[in-house]
Amino acid sequence: MITGLLKKVFGSRNERLIKQYRRTVEQINALEPKFEKLSDDELRGMTETFRQRHAGGESLEALLPEAFAVCREASKRIMKMRHFDVQMIGGMVLNDNKIAEMRTGEGKTLTATLAVYLNALTGKGVHVVTVNDYLAQRDAEWMGRLYNFLGLSVGVNLSQMPHDQKQIAYNADITYGTNNEFGFDYLRDNMVYDPSQRVQRPLHYAIVDEVDSILIDEARTPLIISGQAENQTDLYQRMNGIPKLLERQIGEEKADGTGVEKPGDYYVDEKGHQVYLTEAGHEKAEQILSQLGLISEGESLYAPQNITLMHHLYAALRAHSLFHRDQHYVVQNDEVIIVDEFTGRLMTGRRWSDGLHQAVEAKEGVTVQQENQTLATITFQNYFRMYEKLAGMTGTADTEAYEFQEIYGLEVVVIPTNRQAQRKDLQDQIYKTSKERYDAVVRDIRDCYDRGQPVLVGTTSIETSEYLSDLLNKEKLPHQVLNAKQHAREAEIVAQAGRPKMVTIATNMAGRGTDIVLGGNVEKQAGFIEADANLSDAEKAERIAKLKDEWQSLHDQVKAAGGLHIVGTERHESRRIDNQLRGRAGRQGDPGSSRFYLSLDDQLLRIFAGDRVRAIMERLKMPEGEPIEAGIVTRSIESAQRKVEGRNFDIRKQLLQYDDVANDQRKEIYKLRNDVLESQDVGDMVANLRESVLVEVFREYVPAESMEEQWDIAGLEQRLRDDWGLELPLAKTIEGAQSIEDEELLDMILKAAREHYDAKVAQVGRESFAGFERSVMLQSIDTHWREHLAALDHLRQGIHLRGYAQKDPKQEYKRESFELFARLLDVIKSEVTRVVFNVHIQSPEELEQASEQIEEGLAHLENVQYKHDEFAEGAEPVEQAEPARSNTAAAALAAMGGEAALAGMPKVGRNDPCPCGSGKKFKQCHGKLS
């Protein structure tokens, strides 16, 4: 109440910001006549003038009015479009590291050009981030004309693009690309073995289009580059039959033992998107697994050796109970392809993690692909927070304003529309059953069709869109279907969705990127005429004029019929997605309307609000086919949506808190890796590592401040001989001296080690040896970082159970992951030192060859999978790499001397510790190569 009163007196913060920006818009408008008088060359020359002024110390804020005025004038000449005042405000919001919420059709793409042009003057590069390759390429070509006219270079960064073209794209002043590709390029740049192989420059400024989709919807899904792990495809197929033998329990058992409507073997928690075996289910599963010969008679599923089976069983249960064909995925060309739940697009190449994708493949009877091991991973939150400046734009961000501020420090500013919105949002209609709901939808579509009004029908799954299409076919109503399966025709279908009597059924319209213009889109047809070489300029002009006249007539006809009508067949769990669908109607002051048709069978209502609404319907004794249409019901649905949004926010926040721990470690490892990569000579680094490791070894046998009687000199001599090949007469030295300090012994060892190392370097030359050392260090860092990521993943999966011991899982995760990281650094240090110290090469030629062999062994980016990992549901965005060798020492020794290097090793049992000192079993280390 008090907040509302203050807003009335002082205006909201949003209104105050808009007022400030309007003052700057007045300055820009005052400059317009001045720049209109300039020739094209003079206007283009302003870019270089601005660059020099900025280099001379003038801030971008000081340049802003003139730069925006120049950009607007160039757009008028090249694009035949003049930025509206509200677009100028949008450009300033983007430059101020904020999110501009602009309604659909208000020209976000053109608005972005203002902030992009201004920030490109720094020469540090601007990234414009879109949701798919089609939009990246379209916007780069479309707006590239404007930037090129102003003397700026434009690049487009697409997936599967050759390496040299990527470097050119990133070196341009402005780079368009998708969020996934920018993130994967960052990870790939931190896996290269030569600085010249990197593609990205330091991250300076990014504008994220559809910012809510990228920074919120996809923030639950880390990007992952992975390589193949152990092959267990047969196990997935054997496990696939088990869910069919188990019965589903209806209702969840409460603390008092009530709540179960029908007992069963497993319970599906739709709200938490999880499956749980009941006690009876455990016993039944154990019997089935015993019959299959997967566990011994009477053995528990929880025995340590059966944990993997437990993991596979739950993956199979989730695949059968929670993931449905044509809703969560489609099957094409012997592959299971994920459908993006927010946009309805196919996510080719992405795979769910934790064995879920393999379980779905087994369920659908397609080829089961191997599981993957993570090589590198990052979340969008942590990737985008690395930019010096970050801004975004979307049609719907205000509902998530708190999250943008909390996670990214980005303020949302709602930009006023250029013309007053005229869309009518009608109240939801709720029916008892799905059949009644779809009958009402078909009646509404028929009514609009008869009046010549175009209709856009939004569905939440491919299955629903195809079911509705069948109903319309029976009614002989012509229509177009736009879902993940019709991806290729997307732009064409959307462009014509505003023509009279046009009925378009679409799965979630988020990120479609094409406006629905009343009367249809003439730009595309005009483009075909322009491209026709057989027509003269006069004929082209005549045909385009005729086309525009026809369009005007259709446009007026549709406006008279009420504009575009939006029909929602189900509420999405996010209000924002519903608002995006509604936002397709009523663009730029056009008329339009929207209505959602719901049924009590809908997932959102069933889980969160079904009982309450059903009780209202029964109390009112609603006859069949009669809907409820009341504000109280609509409010209760919005309350349910808020609950889901809150839960999803908590999931994303929790993911970020855990990933922040890994992120700090990632930064350190990548910094270390880049230091190695960029140093001219890593000899000093190796010398420091060698000294540090030898001091630790020495102190194991000669503790600090200890008496001579406590020293284990025989053990130290043996260790130096076995691990380092150093024959040092330490015992004789001590005997021959009247008294000796431990520091003298240490100096003696360090000196001998230094001489041993210098002799090796002298043998082959400093330059050749430095290349070898760099390869060994990079290989060691990469191998153990991969293993560390797997360990962190394993730690995270079970860390929540610490809560039962009254411990804070997050604090426990921080503590244990830090211990793992300290151990990782120790292992890298000792392994690099040992490999470099023990290498045996006779000639420079052999050393060169060995170094090349190692680098070939490291070319693990040829067969890589790129994943965008679904955190909440187990899905992961993946890239597929060659199975990497698990031990650097083995790889390096094999490279140095091949079989001969291994032949010199003592005879060891497969389960004994490996003599290389890695701490692993022999079969998991050098035994793999022998």
UniProtKB/Swiss-Prot annotation:
GO biological process per UniProt: intracellular protein transmembrane transport; protein import; protein targeting; protein transport by the Sec complex
Binding site for ATP: 87, 105-109, 515
Cofactor(s) recorded in Swiss-Prot or TrEMBL: Zn(2+)
Membrane-protein topology: Peripheral membrane protein
Superkingdom in the source lineage: Bacteria
Name assigned to this protein: Protein translocase subunit SecA
Phylogenetic classification of the source organism: Bacteria, Pseudomonadati, Pseudomonadota, Betaproteobacteria, Burkholderiales
EC number per UniProt: 7.4.2.8
Primary gene name: secA
Subunit-structure text: Monomer and homodimer. Part of the essential Sec protein translocation apparatus which comprises SecA, SecYEG and auxiliary proteins SecDF-YajC and YidC.
Predominant subcellular localization, coarse grouping: membrane
Subcellular location: Cell inner membrane; Cytoplasm
Keyword annotations: ATP-binding, Cell inner membrane, Cell membrane, Cytoplasm, Membrane, Metal-binding, Nucleotide-binding, Protein transport, Translocase, Translocation, Transport, Zinc
PROSITE patterns in the record: SECA, SECA_MOTOR_DEAD
Native species: Cupriavidus metallidurans (strain ATCC 43123 / DSM 2839 / NBRC 102507 / CH34) (Ralstonia metallidurans)
Residue sites binding Zn(2+) per the record: 914, 916, 925-926
Chain's role: Part of the Sec protein translocase complex. Interacts with the SecYEG preprotein conducting channel. Has a central role in coupling the hydrolysis of ATP to the transfer of proteins into and across the cell membrane, serving both as a receptor for the preprotein-SecB complex and as an ATP-driven molecular motor driving the stepwise translocation of polypeptide chains across the membrane.
Pfam assignment, any one: P-loop_SecA
